């Protein structure tokens, strides 16, 4: 139980990766605050973990609502030890098809929320001289949109930039910042946007011959959240099955 007495906040908790991350952190003894916009789903998720998981429904694209929620959390929890910025909106639209409305929506959820949450939890982490910031990016951040559309790829590239900036600034305070960049995770958000033909084509391009499982991403997050990862900061953990060699 290496995370006993630690409190973690996980966004997008009811998605494939988010659910697996919540399970992994609770299994290591952490108390988890689960964020999701679906109140029924996040409540049901939390009920499965008893008192180890606190459900909170919030639209991460609404900055004012998010800041209000974080103010309430600050009054209930002394410190958030681990922040997992996992929530994301996916779009397959390439450059010409990307509207400004879609661009702003993706940036609000995928990037702005990560910034606001990081700003909210870091002061207590610094005072406590311990903290873990973990950002779920994507192979799209460096693949030029191979696996996703323009707005999504840009937002995930910016997540890596946020990770690097946070890592450099916060290292002297015992706070680490790292990212995980998976490709083609078996989850509704990813798989529902791929036709059977697309799935077969992508499988053929992945050297390991399969898609990534949510539990594999959660395993990486669990390690980055643990005390044993203390010498790692500013690192992007690539999980693409060798796709970069294609």
Regions found by a protein language model. Give the residues of each.
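Active-site helix of classical SDR
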Residues: 118, 155, 163
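Short, small/polar-rich loop/turn modules that mediate ligand/substrate recognition or access, typified
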Residues: 171-176, 232-234
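Alpha-helical segment proximal to the catalytic Tyr-Lys
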Residues: 123, 168-169, 230
């Amino acid at each position: 139980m290496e995370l006993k007495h630690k409190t973690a906040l996980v966004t997008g908790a009811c998605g494939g990766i988010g659910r697996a991350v919540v399970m992994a952190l609770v299994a290591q003894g952490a108390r988890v605050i689960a964020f999701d916009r679906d109140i029924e789903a996040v409540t049901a998720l939390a009920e499965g973990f008893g008192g180890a998981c606190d459900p909170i429904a919030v639209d991460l694209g609404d900055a004012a609502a998010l800041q209000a929620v974080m103010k309430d959390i600050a009054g209930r929890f002394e410190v958030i030890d681990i922040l997992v910025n996992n929530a994301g909106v996916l779009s397959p639209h390439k450059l010409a098809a990307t509207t400004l409305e879609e661009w702003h929506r993706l940036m609000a959820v995928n990037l702005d929320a990560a910034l606001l949450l990081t700003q909210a939890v870091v002061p207590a982490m610094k005072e406590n001289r311990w903290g873990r910031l973990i950002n779920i990016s994507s192979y799209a951040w460096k693949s030029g949109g191979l696996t996703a559309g323009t707005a999504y790829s840009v937002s995930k590239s910016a997540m890596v930039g946020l990770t690097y900036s946070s890592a450099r600034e916060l290292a002297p305070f015992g706070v680490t910042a790292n990212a995980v960049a998976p490709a083609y995770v078996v989850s509704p958000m990813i798989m529902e946007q791929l036709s059977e033909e697309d799935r077969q084509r992508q499988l053929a391009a992945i050297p390991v011959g399969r898609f990534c499982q949510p539990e594999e991403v959660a395993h990486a997050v669990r390690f980055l959240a643990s005390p044993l990862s203390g010498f790692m900061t500013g690192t992007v953990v690539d999980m693409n099955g060798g796709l970069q060699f294609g």
